Amino acid sequence: MKILPIKIKGSIFTLLVLYLQNHPVELFKNNLRDKIKNFPTLFKNAPIAINVEKCSNEINWNNIKNAIISCGFNIIGVSGCKNGKLKNNIIKSGLPILSEGKEVFNFFNNINLDDKILSFEKKNYNKTPIFNSPIRSGQKIYANNSDLIITNNVNSGAEVIADGNIHIYGEVRGRVLAGAKGDNTCQIFCTKLFSELVAISGEYLLSGDFSEDTIGNSVKIYMKNKKLHIVKLN
């Protein structure tokens, strides 16, 4: 069988989507910096899609684009564009127009509740949400002002986030982010570590950073001296 030099296949990627409103560029830029300050390294050079559905036809697209890039993001495309003039300006700037499916994670305009996001709005750490089912690829869980407990597997491509601690009694292959609002005393516990990424209060480690003795084992992840540490549990 002849082996072709390339293959073209369809695939699905999980992306952050930035939803723009009709506000002055400097105000929006400052707000964006405030939103990402708890995760400065996690979002450095991160790919992001821009939704302009609620923007007026008179926005200065080049100024907006430059403001987003200056915050450390790589724009991969723009969605929600219904105005012909704006669409042409976006295309001329070198970016594609995206056909947007169902949004899975609206990070910068509060966290939405849809069929792929489960959000828990709590004023106090009174009750910890518990998930007994597997967290599937593409699904995102967010526990607001709370710890999070999962008694099953977190699949590759899934993302679990909590403002408090995270406990996972299962195999972890997706992303795990604790202390999402900046609490660096939060910790992550899991019984089988294969995670793509773990993060606490903006500091993160990728799977390639894990030591061999922690991979696939029961571990505790915590922050000390502004660095993440992973220790194997007995």
From Swiss-Prot:
Q: Name one Pfam family in it.
A: MinC_N
Does the record carry Cell cycle as a key word? Answer: yes
Q: What Gene3D superfamilies does this protein's entry cite?
A: 2.160.20.70, 3.30.70.260
Looking up SUPFAM superfamilies in the UniProt record yields: Cell-division inhibitor MinC, C-terminal domain (SSF63848)
Under the heading InterPro entries, the entry gives: CAP/MinC_C (IPR016098), MinC (IPR013033), MinC_C_sf (IPR036145), MinC_N (IPR007874), Septum_form_inhib_MinC_C (IPR005526)
Provide a GO biological process annotation: division septum assembly
Establish whether keyword Cell cycle is in the entry. Answer: yes
- Keywords of this entry: Cell cycle, Cell division, Septation
Q: What is its quaternary makeup?
A: Interacts with MinD and FtsZ.
Record's function text: Cell division inhibitor that blocks the formation of polar Z ring septums. Rapidly oscillates between the poles of the cell to destabilize FtsZ filaments that have formed before they mature into polar Z rings. Prevents FtsZ polymerization.
Mind telling me which NCBIfam families this protein's record contains? minC
Family in the record: Belongs to the MinC family.
Q: What is this protein called?
A: Probable septum site-determining protein MinC
The organism named in the record is Buchnera aphidicola subsp. Baizongia pistaciae (strain Bp)
